[in-house]
Amino acid sequence: MLFLKRSYRIFIFLISLFAYAQISVASESISIGTLDQDALFRNSLFGKRVLQEVSDESELLLAKELSLQSELETEEQSLTVKRKTIGTEEFIKLAAAFDEKVQKIRSETTEARIKLNKYSDEERNRFFQIALPILVQLSEELGLSTLLDHRMVILSLKNITDIAVDRVDKVIGNGREIISE
Protein backbone atom coordinates (compact mmCIF):
# COMPACT_ATOMS: atom_id res chain seq x y z
CA MET A 1 0.00 0.00 0.00
CA LEU A 2 2.84 2.34 0.86
CA PHE A 3 4.42 1.50 -2.48
CA LEU A 4 1.19 2.45 -4.33
CA LYS A 5 0.92 5.75 -2.49
CA ARG A 6 4.53 6.53 -3.27
CA SER A 7 4.12 5.49 -6.92
CA TYR A 8 0.97 7.59 -7.16
CA ARG A 9 2.83 10.63 -5.80
CA ILE A 10 5.68 10.11 -8.25
CA PHE A 11 3.16 9.69 -11.07
CA ILE A 12 1.38 12.93 -10.10
CA PHE A 13 4.73 14.69 -9.82
CA LEU A 14 5.79 13.50 -13.28
CA ILE A 15 2.43 14.52 -14.78
CA SER A 16 2.81 17.95 -13.19
CA LEU A 17 6.32 18.32 -14.62
CA PHE A 18 5.10 17.26 -18.04
CA ALA A 19 2.17 19.70 -17.92
CA TYR A 20 4.47 22.51 -16.78
CA ALA A 21 6.88 21.73 -19.62
CA GLN A 22 4.02 21.83 -22.12
CA ILE A 23 2.79 25.16 -20.76
CA SER A 24 6.32 26.58 -20.88
CA VAL A 25 6.84 25.46 -24.48
CA ALA A 26 3.41 26.79 -25.49
CA SER A 27 3.97 30.13 -23.82
CA GLU A 28 7.34 30.53 -25.52
CA SER A 29 5.80 29.92 -28.94
CA ILE A 30 3.09 32.54 -28.48
CA SER A 31 4.35 35.97 -29.37
CA ILE A 32 1.91 38.85 -29.35
CA GLY A 33 2.43 42.20 -31.01
CA THR A 34 0.34 45.33 -30.98
CA LEU A 35 -0.52 47.77 -33.72
CA ASP A 36 -1.96 51.27 -33.54
CA GLN A 37 -4.33 51.11 -36.50
CA ASP A 38 -5.07 54.83 -36.41
CA ALA A 39 -1.37 55.70 -36.43
CA LEU A 40 -0.71 53.18 -39.20
CA PHE A 41 -3.29 54.86 -41.41
CA ARG A 42 -2.48 58.43 -40.36
CA ASN A 43 1.30 58.05 -40.78
CA SER A 44 1.29 56.01 -43.99
CA LEU A 45 1.66 57.72 -47.36
CA PHE A 46 -1.74 56.33 -48.33
CA GLY A 47 -3.40 57.70 -45.19
CA LYS A 48 -1.66 61.07 -45.50
CA ARG A 49 -2.94 61.38 -49.07
CA VAL A 50 -6.51 60.53 -48.08
CA LEU A 51 -6.46 62.83 -45.04
CA GLN A 52 -5.10 65.68 -47.19
CA GLU A 53 -7.77 65.12 -49.85
CA VAL A 54 -10.49 65.12 -47.20
CA SER A 55 -9.04 68.24 -45.56
CA ASP A 56 -8.81 70.06 -48.89
CA GLU A 57 -12.36 69.12 -49.83
CA SER A 58 -13.62 70.15 -46.37
CA GLU A 59 -12.01 73.56 -46.80
CA LEU A 60 -13.64 73.96 -50.22
CA LEU A 61 -17.01 72.98 -48.77
CA LEU A 62 -16.59 75.43 -45.91
CA ALA A 63 -15.65 78.26 -48.28
CA LYS A 64 -18.67 77.45 -50.44
CA GLU A 65 -20.94 77.35 -47.38
CA LEU A 66 -19.67 80.73 -46.17
CA SER A 67 -20.17 82.25 -49.61
CA LEU A 68 -23.69 80.85 -49.83
CA GLN A 69 -24.44 82.06 -46.31
CA SER A 70 -23.35 85.56 -47.27
CA GLU A 71 -25.51 85.45 -50.41
CA LEU A 72 -28.50 84.21 -48.43
CA GLU A 73 -28.09 86.93 -45.82
CA THR A 74 -28.00 89.57 -48.56
CA GLU A 75 -31.06 88.04 -50.21
CA GLU A 76 -32.88 87.89 -46.87
CA GLN A 77 -32.14 91.57 -46.21
CA SER A 78 -33.38 92.43 -49.70
CA LEU A 79 -36.54 90.45 -49.05
CA THR A 80 -37.05 92.30 -45.76
CA VAL A 81 -36.77 95.64 -47.57
CA LYS A 82 -39.15 94.47 -50.34
CA ARG A 83 -41.70 93.45 -47.74
CA LYS A 84 -42.47 97.12 -47.10
CA THR A 85 -43.10 97.85 -50.79
CA ILE A 86 -44.92 94.76 -52.09
CA GLY A 87 -48.22 93.09 -51.39
CA THR A 88 -48.69 90.31 -48.88
CA GLU A 89 -49.37 87.59 -51.47
CA GLU A 90 -46.29 88.50 -53.49
CA PHE A 91 -44.17 88.58 -50.32
CA ILE A 92 -45.47 85.15 -49.26
CA LYS A 93 -44.46 83.74 -52.68
CA LEU A 94 -40.99 85.31 -52.48
CA ALA A 95 -40.53 84.14 -48.88
CA ALA A 96 -41.60 80.60 -49.80
CA ALA A 97 -39.17 80.57 -52.75
CA PHE A 98 -36.40 81.86 -50.49
CA ASP A 99 -37.18 79.22 -47.86
CA GLU A 100 -37.15 76.51 -50.54
CA LYS A 101 -33.77 77.77 -51.76
CA VAL A 102 -32.36 77.69 -48.22
CA GLN A 103 -33.64 74.13 -47.67
CA LYS A 104 -32.15 73.00 -50.98
CA ILE A 105 -28.76 74.49 -50.10
CA ARG A 106 -28.82 72.86 -46.66
CA SER A 107 -29.71 69.53 -48.22
CA GLU A 108 -26.92 69.81 -50.81
CA THR A 109 -24.42 70.81 -48.13
CA THR A 110 -25.39 67.90 -45.90
CA GLU A 111 -25.21 65.53 -48.87
CA ALA A 112 -21.72 66.80 -49.76
CA ARG A 113 -20.52 66.27 -46.17
CA ILE A 114 -21.99 62.77 -46.07
CA LYS A 115 -20.34 61.96 -49.41
CA LEU A 116 -16.98 63.20 -48.12
CA ASN A 117 -17.29 61.14 -44.91
CA LYS A 118 -18.26 58.10 -46.96
CA TYR A 119 -15.21 58.58 -49.19
CA SER A 120 -12.97 58.85 -46.12
CA ASP A 121 -14.43 55.67 -44.59
CA GLU A 122 -14.21 53.75 -47.87
CA GLU A 123 -10.59 54.75 -48.42
CA ARG A 124 -9.69 53.77 -44.85
CA ASN A 125 -11.34 50.37 -45.34
CA ARG A 126 -9.60 49.95 -48.70
CA PHE A 127 -6.27 50.78 -47.07
CA PHE A 128 -6.68 48.07 -44.44
CA GLN A 129 -7.78 45.53 -47.05
CA ILE A 130 -4.63 46.26 -49.04
CA ALA A 131 -2.42 46.40 -45.93
CA LEU A 132 -3.68 43.14 -44.38
CA PRO A 133 -1.42 40.79 -46.38
CA ILE A 134 1.53 43.07 -45.63
CA LEU A 135 0.74 42.95 -41.91
CA VAL A 136 0.41 39.17 -42.04
CA GLN A 137 3.81 38.85 -43.74
CA LEU A 138 5.39 41.30 -41.30
CA SER A 139 3.91 39.42 -38.32
CA GLU A 140 5.32 36.16 -39.67
CA GLU A 141 8.76 37.72 -40.16
CA LEU A 142 8.72 39.03 -36.60
CA GLY A 143 7.56 35.67 -35.24
CA LEU A 144 4.23 36.99 -34.02
CA SER A 145 1.38 34.55 -33.63
CA THR A 146 -1.09 37.27 -32.70
CA LEU A 147 -1.45 40.94 -33.58
CA LEU A 148 -3.80 43.06 -31.45
CA ASP A 149 -4.98 46.63 -31.71
CA HIS A 150 -3.13 48.69 -29.08
CA ARG A 151 -6.42 49.92 -27.59
CA MET A 152 -7.23 46.39 -26.45
CA VAL A 153 -3.95 45.91 -24.58
CA ILE A 154 -2.84 47.33 -21.25
CA LEU A 155 0.88 46.68 -21.72
CA SER A 156 2.83 45.74 -24.82
CA LEU A 157 6.51 45.18 -25.28
CA LYS A 158 6.22 44.63 -29.02
CA ASN A 159 4.42 47.48 -30.82
CA ILE A 160 5.07 47.12 -34.54
CA THR A 161 3.26 50.24 -35.76
CA ASP A 162 6.34 52.12 -36.96
CA ILE A 163 7.72 49.06 -38.74
CA ALA A 164 4.30 48.46 -40.31
CA VAL A 165 4.08 52.06 -41.57
CA ASP A 166 7.48 51.71 -43.26
CA ARG A 167 6.57 48.37 -44.83
CA VAL A 168 3.14 49.51 -46.03
CA ASP A 169 4.65 52.66 -47.54
CA LYS A 170 7.21 50.58 -49.43
CA VAL A 171 4.58 48.23 -50.81
CA ILE A 172 1.57 50.47 -51.57
CA GLY A 173 2.92 54.02 -51.38
CA ASN A 174 0.18 56.63 -51.35
CA GLY A 175 -2.29 54.28 -53.04
CA ARG A 176 -2.77 56.28 -56.23
CA GLU A 177 -1.15 53.55 -58.31
CA ILE A 178 -3.48 50.88 -56.99
CA ILE A 179 -6.42 50.23 -59.28
CA SER A 180 -9.58 50.07 -57.20
CA GLU A 181 -11.69 47.05 -57.83
Could you say what each language-model-derived stretch is?
Residues Y20-A26:
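Sec/Tat signal peptide C-region and signal peptidase I cleavage site
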Residues L2-F11:
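Bacterial N-terminal signal peptides that target proteins for export
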Residues A26-E181:
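Amphipathic, charged alpha-helical segments and their helix-to-coil junctions
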Residues F11-Y20:
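Bacterial N-terminal signal peptides
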